[in-house]
Amino acid sequence: ALKNLDLNLERGRFIGLLGPNGSGKTTTIKLLNGLLQPTAGTVTIDGMQPGRGTHSIVSYLPDRACLDENMKVADIIDFFSDFYRDFDRVKATEMLNTLNLSSLSRLKALSKGNREKVQLILTMSRRAQLYILDEPIAGVDPAARDYILNTILANYSEDASVLLSTHLIADIERVLD
């Protein structure tokens, strides 16, 4: 699906990976996260091949939910806090409070838009060097899209980069570098 791709992301940049469905955006992101292996060429992040070493510097929001819907939001925050040394529990709680979401809510009791927001909160609560966000605004209403984009802008470090994939180009043009 991908040929002759050369991608160099500078720190502090907000980069869009734009294109129609089926154009290789998710494949690129899976290569960057080590979920797929290239058939030719190499992939490196900060000089390392994607894997355990890069998991500590990359915060990844997949295009599909990967959380147990029976869990309470508080339990998921506990899990992320235990799993990621760079997870900022205070930041996650502040973002939840801004949404008026109870940490005692189970994921399955939340709307699709609010489940997406919880996943985004988890991703953006890490002090990562690279945030890779796969279609974070797909399938949610325009108000949720605005919240998601504003949350990303307000919560990534200027020392970090954001790579956001989408086919909804008009919705994110204003935030891209």
Give short role names for the model-derived ranges.
Residues 63-119, 126:
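ABC-family P-loop ATPase nucleotide-binding domains
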Residues 40-54:
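Conserved ABC transporter NBD signature motif
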Residues 131-135, 140:
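Catalytic Walker B motif of ABC-type/P-loop ATPase nucleotide-binding domains
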Residues 145-158:
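Helical segment within the ABC ATPase nucleotide-binding domain
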Residues 33:
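Helix-to-loop junction immediately C-terminal to a conserved catalytic motif
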